[in-house]
UniProtKB/Swiss-Prot annotation:
Known function: F(1)F(0) ATP synthase produces ATP from ADP in the presence of a proton or sodium gradient. F-type ATPases consist of two structural domains, F(1) containing the extramembraneous catalytic core and F(0) containing the membrane proton channel, linked together by a central stalk and a peripheral stalk. During catalysis, ATP synthesis in the catalytic domain of F(1) is coupled via a rotary mechanism of the central stalk subunits to proton translocation.
Its membrane topology: Single-pass membrane protein
GO cellular component: plasma membrane-derived thylakoid membrane; proton-transporting ATP synthase complex
Keyword Phosphoprotein annotated: no
Compartment(s) of residence: Cellular thylakoid membrane
Lipid biosynthesis in keyword set: no
Primary location: membrane
TM region positions: 28-45
Protein name: ATP synthase subunit b'
Keywords associated with the record: ATP synthesis, CF(0), Hydrogen ion transport, Ion transport, Membrane, Thylakoid, Transmembrane, Transmembrane helix, Transport
GO function term, MF aspect, one: proton-transporting ATPase activity, rotational mechanism
Length: 163
């Protein structure tokens, strides 16, 4: 029985209104919707859009600034690396020059020491030769003196003087 009451109520409503009634509610709802859209636009959408646009601009500026700083840092790093490589090459050149100079000085000192040693050897050989000659001369005199003494003892002093 309750179903019959519900069906009768539905039939009565369906006969009266149809799809919708054209009265003052529809234009009033449209005005309310437009008014709500204007209020929301003024109070929410425009400030929110401005905030989003400001944030996008801030992010874009920071990104551009970061890219500029990165490129400057890369350029500075490259310049530093080039300067460092130049300094290394210069240091290697200085080291090589110093080593060559040290070898040259060492070779000169060795040559001078060899010359000095050779001169000392020659001087020592000369002194030895001179002492040898003096020793031979001294020995010759001693041999002559001894020979005379022997002859004097053997032959006598008078015979040796006649000769």
């Amino acid at each position: 029985m309750t179903h019959w009451i519900t069906l009768l109520a539905v039939e009565k409503v369906a006969k009266e209104g149809g799809l919708f009634d054209l009265d003052a509610t529809l234009p009033l709802m449209a005005i309310q919707f437009l008014l709500l859209a204007l209020i929301l636009n003024a109070t929410l959408y425009k400030p929110l859009g401005k905030a989003i646009d400001g944030r996008n601009e801030y992010v874009r500026n920071n990104q551009l600034e970061a890219q500029e700083r990165l490129s400057k840092a890369e350029k500075l790093a490259e310049a530093y690396e080039q300067e460092l490589a130049g300094a290394r090459r210069q240091a290697q050149t200085i080291i090589a020059d110093a080593q060559a100079e040290a070898q040259k000085i060492a070779a000169e000192k060795v040559a001078a020491a060899q010359k000095e040693a050779q001169a000392q050897r020659e001087q020592a050989a000369g002194e030895i030769e001179q002492q040898k000659q003096q020793a031979l001369a001294s020995l010759e005199q001693q041999v002559d003196a001894l020979s005379r003494q022997i002859l004097e003892k053997l032959l006598g002093a008078d015979l040796v003087k006649q000769r």
